[in-house]
Structures are given as structure tokens and as C-alpha cells.
Amino acid sequence: MSLTSAPESGLAPLEFAVSRNLHTKSDAERAELLVDPQFGTTFTDHMIDVCWSVGGGWHRPRVQPYGPLALDPAAAVLHYGQEIFEGIKAYRHADGSIWTFRPDANGRRLQRSARRLALPELPVEYFIQSLRELIAVDGAWVPSGADQSLYLRPFMFAKEAFLGVRPANKVGYYVIASPVGAYFKGGAKPVSIWLSEQYARAGKGGTGAAKTGGNYAASLLPQAEAYEQGCDQVVFLDQDRNVEELGGMNIVFVYKDGTLVTPQSPSILEGITRDSILQLAADRGHKVEGRSVSIDEWREGVASGDIVEVFACGTAAVVAPIGVLKGTDFIDEQPLGELALSLREELTDIQYGRREDTHGWLVRLDG
């Protein structure tokens, strides 16, 4: 289930023009913001902007001050949703160096998303270079507190101005960054899950495997329903009542024989955190499977003791144990074990440089 591929070769690097922000935060202002950063509310001083056009390819790469984008009201993204994005973090290690985790996998996933949304495929080298270019000017924004990081958000959208259903001839690729703190204050806590049976996240042959905004927009109403039911997150089923994923995280079941099973389907986003967690589990000798898991197998497995642990995983939370599954006519307490949190600790230790990276997952962004 590895998502990592060999990088493309033979590409000359982009030559970024750098326009410095003349109104950057002072060291004192930035330090205050980094004390307890909230997810996605504070942004660094600069951003990446790269253009693409039919015939012109990728061109005019720039590092520029963070600020509003000028869009024509007829920009295709506003009408037809031709948009994709990624999420990846930069970590400050104890020696002050700045690293990221499996950026080649994120770059490949962005390419798959682009293919599905009829957008141009950004070379993985350019993807990684764009992260390095932003860190070169905004590296001071990478926090050093426990479980803190700089969340990097690459995204791409159709910006050609026209009305008509066709792939756009002009596209923009951007990267912005936001310092973030620990997802769970005081350590990872079990989350409660609402079973959505009225709504679907994605359909067969649809865009479920792409990281595109429409999938997340479709999850907002059922997520609101989950909140109304007193739950933290929502889990979706496919048309055959097989478990798919949460609104923004993959799900993993741990069976009493030590096997880890994760739902596998063309309509599920291939999670890089999930792939890494499963690799670490396999390194420990656990059997790992990707297959369909019905909601009945989940509930009956918990009731019989065959399933001994259930957890969700993703870039933001890393790993979140699932403590409760709630439906319209049931509330199932979920068994809590030690494996999820043990794997979470191992993964974050690798990301922050506290444990040896035997898989070559870390890539340095500074220096």
C-alpha cells in the first residue's frame, strides 16, 4: 500500500523570483503568535505563486507577500469547482533544522488529484521545491513547542475566465503556511463518531480518491449533524454499507489476532499518515490488510470482542482513538487499546527527529 514513488528526473529547477513582504511580523509579534497557534487561523508572511497555461506550461514562479488573490468573477473555479489541495507539515528538530515528512507521496497524490480534476500535473520536484522556497523566507515561523509544526497548504485551481464546462487553459498553483499546535491538548483523546446513513461522501467512479474541496463541502452538512448528536466526527458508508472514511481521516480496525484492517476502495482518499502507520505496524510484525469492512462487521466485531481497537488517522490529528460509535438507534462503546497511541508516538518521534528514520521518509527543507 506504499504511496511513495521514485521522483521524476531530468527537470531543471524553477527559478523563483522573490518579492519580500515589507510589513512582516516582528520577532516579538511572531513569538506571541507561536505560543499557542490555532489550526488555520494565522498565516506566515509569504506565499508561493506559480502559473500554468496551455502551451506555456509551468512558468512565472514567485515567492510573494501573503495576501488576497485577484480573481475574475468568471474564473472557472468559482463555477465548476476545478480545484485540488494538499496538506503537509514542516517540523523543527532539536538542532533547529526544518524537515518535512514524505513530500514525494504528497506530490504524487496531488498529481492523482489533478488527473481526476483535469488539471495539470505538477512535477514532484517542483512540489518539493515550492515547499523549500517558502521555508527559505518563512522558516522562522516553524514553531519549536511540543507537538507544534508549520502546516503547509499547497493548492491548485482553474483561474481562466470563461463560462463553459471544459478544463481550464489557465491554472494557478499556490502554497500558504499556518503554524499549528497540538491537535489534542494534553494528549490524544478518544473521539465520538456519528454514523451517517443519509449522506454519502463520494460515489462509485466519483472524486472520492481526489483531495478536492467538493468532497469536503459535501461532508459539512453530515458533520453538522454529528455535532447535533454530540459527536466529534462523522463516518461515511458506501452504497453497499461498507465503511469508507471520516470527514477528513482514514479509519483502521485492530483485530484480536493483531491484524490491522483498513477500508480499501477507489472512492477513499489514500492517506499518507495511514500508509505510514500501517508500515510501522508491519515493521512490528502485525499483519496489515486493505479490504472492505461493512458496518455490520464493525459492530458485530466489537460486540464479539473480535475487534479490539478502532482509530482514525490523518495529517492534522495524526492518530485519534475512536471511543464511541453512535447511530440513529444505537450507541456502541468502542474498545480502547494501546496500539494506536503507541504507533502515534513512534510516528511523531520520527517526524520530530527523536527516533531514527529507517524508511527515509524525512526530507530537509532548510539549508
Region roles according to the model:
Residues 2-137, 149, 155, 162-367:
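Helix-start/capping segments and mature chain N-termini
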